[in-house]
Amino acid sequence: MEKLFVPSFPKTFLNYQTPAKVENSPELHPKSRKKNLSFTKKKEPNIIPDEQFDYLCRNGSLLEAEKALDSLFQQGSKVKRSTYLKLLESCIDSGSIHLGRILHARFGLFTEPDVFVETKLLSMYAKCGCIADARKVFDSMRERNLFTWSAMIGAYSRENRWREVAKLFRLMMKDGVLPDDFLFPKILQGCANCGDVEAGKVIHSVVIKLGMSSCLRVSNSILAVYAKCGELDFATKFFRRMRERDVIAWNSVLLAYCQNGKHEEAVELVKEMEKEGISPGLVTWNILIGGYNQLGKCDAAMDLMQKMETFGITADVFTWTAMISGLIHNGMRYQALDMFRKMFLAGVVPNAVTIMSAVSACSCLKVINQGSEVHSIAVKMGFIDDVLVGNSLVDMYSKCGKLEDARKVFDSVKNKDVYTWNSMITGYCQAGYCGKAYELFTRMQDANLRPNIITWNTMISGYIKNGDEGEAMDLFQRMEKDGKVQRNTATWNLIIAGYIQNGKKDEALELFRKMQFSRFMPNSVTILSLLPACANLLGAKMVREIHGCVLRRNLDAIHAVKNALTDTYAKSGDIEYSRTIFLGMETKDIITWNSLIGGYVLHGSYGPALALFNQMKTQGITPNRGTLSSIILAHGLMGNVDEGKKVFYSIANDYHIIPALEHCSAMVYLYGRANRLEEALQFIQEMNIQSETPIWESFLTGCRIHGDIDMAIHAAENLFSLEPENTATESIVSQIYALGAKLGRSLEGNKPRRDNLLKKPLGQSWIEVRNLIHTFTTGDQSKLCTDVLYPLVEKMSRLDNRSDQYNGELWIEEEGREETCGIHSEKFAMAFGLISSSGASKTTIRILKNLRMCRDCHDTAKYVSKRYGCDILLEDTRCLHHFKNGDCSCKDYW
């Protein structure tokens, strides 16, 4: 073959070292020097015979060879070109990069270095694993031929650096060097593995121009590019036009069909393949098995694996590994471990990927015993030094909570990569050991390994889970400046979710706004993290802001986002807009129906809730736990005890669901609201739910509203025994005991221990006006309250004298009376809402309170809604009150 190369401008390949100056030699100056004519031939440098170096290299005496080279250099002697090449070959065989570097530094030991010798030097560096040095030699070469380019491309191929292979091809074309039929497949392999289909198309055109289309090896490589890059149409057309097709070509096009989910067509191709006289080989079967697993059809893949035996083809390690990884990918992890066991029984030796897959299954299942067994197998079979196996073991032990074992494996991994460090850091973060995680995070950088985006995100997530959002924010701010790693959408989502998790909603919303001005826009995860934080009356405006972002980003096409919006609008007080979103949804699942049904129940609208329930059943949607608890509450609002009881008993009988605490609590509410307290108490005893605080709180509400002091005392005694340290509970119990004593009831239970020192919880209310949240406290003495709000509060309040029993109701409140503790916070909030919205034709005042609203404030809110013609939405710890025209949605039961 003709040598193809393009000369380039001369470059200094290396700085030659001049021989040492001979001592005591006279200094000769040009001017005084006389010409000395001599007709004798100049003496050539000493040439060391090849036999000496051959002997040293054959016996592995590379140290002696190195000394001999140094001696030659000092003497100014030379070695033959063939000797130098043999020395380089010895370095390759022995992997002696040290001697190789010495040979490079002594490049002047032979007189005429050429492109072949330089290419050999390049190969030496590449095969010894020093690809950066190989590239330096390549870039410094005075001329490069086809063999030079082949050596460099081969070096990158061995390192799986496929993008560099594609880049070198482009440089090669610029230099005017054309690949041959041996180099084309290597370059095409690089294009296929890095997904560079455009480079593959360029090579395809070059191949046609060079007339190499008939070369089967090259054609198969072109087909592989189209197949692996997902270009099914190109692959099919090229395959059909191939003059000659061997089993490799058929396998490539089969792979293309399987990767594109066309498995039935792939099976038909196999039949066509057999008609052409080509028998499907092991690789063909493996492709089909892998394809079915990828599609989630593991049973079909298993059938194929059994069927191949009837064709006389025995499954190899790749078949078993494809089956094991396919089962894991499709969530069938126990079956995958069983397949791993069967593989051993079949006498097939696993490879590193098989071990890694088995460890992954153990990790997901958190079966530490089986994981330890796989670890032992990895040690016995020599896979423990494989970095991928080591990484999977670290991950498995970390997820199983065995951090000491994980650390032992981590420390034993010799060539740790970023994933090794990430696995151990993740383990520490998940266990709450952020200090140890940060120590590794620092050590990783000291080891000249830069943390990637996963490392930073893991550290941020760890601090957030530990409740230390300050450290999380510090890392969030440092990562781009110090770590040179750009934040991604997941980073923003983590920090936003962290602030929400730790109760810092305002900071989370501010970050959300900043995120929209960054390179990475919010996604569905961002929205789903934020919306629950807005699911209260103060979040109404923020919900609309988030909804605007959803529309701008076209996230409303995501079903989960629409469900969340339906739920959040209802909880933030806008049930009508919640219904609008619901009606606009083409597909409605059980979560969609539950969101609006629950919203109607929250707003006290039992009629629409029951109508939706019937409509849902008509459309064939089966109710779940959440649906049924909402419907029992709806019947409670309606006062229809018998229908509520039917729904409760249908939970187990019709829907085969075990009734949960939420259903029992709803039933107690149902009985209590209907003043059927004896039945409620009997239900509590029958269901054996006496140890649940929410049950007695619901029961006590019925006792309080209907004025049954004896039942109230019974409920109070149970509440106090369950939560003796709860201040709110103790306050209520104290009031009931005091009222019972006043009414002459004998008290057998233990009284609260802090009767004299008891302080009731401080009432607080919040209201949003002009995008600012204002806080008011009971007995507030701020300038705003004393100068502006007190007169209005006095004006709008009905100051009736109240007794311990008001219309038959027991006067038992979480908050102290206004005569002793001052005006309650919600009255200040209502007054501030009225002042701030004066002049508005239709006003809705939204207030959030931390305690149960007392009867006096409840009556005041009804009066204000009628007197001033405004709607008041007030959410306390019991329910959402909607005051309108002098009425409340709770029907005075809360």
From Swiss-Prot:
Record keywords, A-Z: Repeat
One Gene Ontology cellular component: nucleus
Bilayer-spanning residue ranges: none
Region annotated Type DYW motif, chain positions: 803-894
InterPro entries with a match to the protein in the record: DYW_dom, Pentatricopeptide_rpt, PPR_At4g14850-like_plant, TPR-like_helical_dom_sf
GO MF annotation, one: mRNA binding
Region (Type E motif) residue spans: 695-770
PPR repeats: 80-110, 114-144, 145-179, 180-214, 215-245, 246-280, 281-315, 316-350, 351-385, 386-416, 417-451, 452-486, 488-522, 523-557, 558-588, 589-623, 624-659, 660-694
UniProt region (Type E(+) motif), positions on chain: 771-801
Family as reported in the entry's similarity comment: Belongs to the PPR family. PCMP-H subfamily.
Protein's UniProt name: Pentatricopeptide repeat-containing protein At1g19720
